[in-house]
């Protein structure tokens, strides 16, 4: 996998971290799942 950097508001990161902690996931896992879901519902086939 490649490393990707992006900017996000502090509030969004706080929510992301809280969700990840509650689910026992890493932040990157939550972001990957969110991107896959985003693309899938728009008709893109994602292998991952």
Curated annotation (Swiss-Prot):
Disulfide bonds: none
Coiled-coil residue spans: none
InterPro entries: Arc_rbn_hlx_hlx, CopG, Ribbon_hlx_hlx
Gene3D superfamilies: Met repressor-like
An annotated GO BP: regulation of DNA-templated transcription
Protein name: Uncharacterized protein ORF48
Native source organism of the sequence: Acidianus filamentous virus 1 (isolate United States/Yellowstone)
Source lineage: Viruses, Adnaviria, Zilligvirae, Taleaviricota, Tokiviricetes
């Amino acid at each position: 996998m490649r490393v990707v950097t992006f900017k996000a508001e502090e509030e969004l990161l706080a929510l992301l971290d809280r969700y990840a902690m509650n689910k026992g996931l890493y932040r990157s896992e939550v972001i990957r799942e969110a991107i896959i879901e985003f693309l899938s519902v728009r008709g893109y086939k994602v292998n991952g």
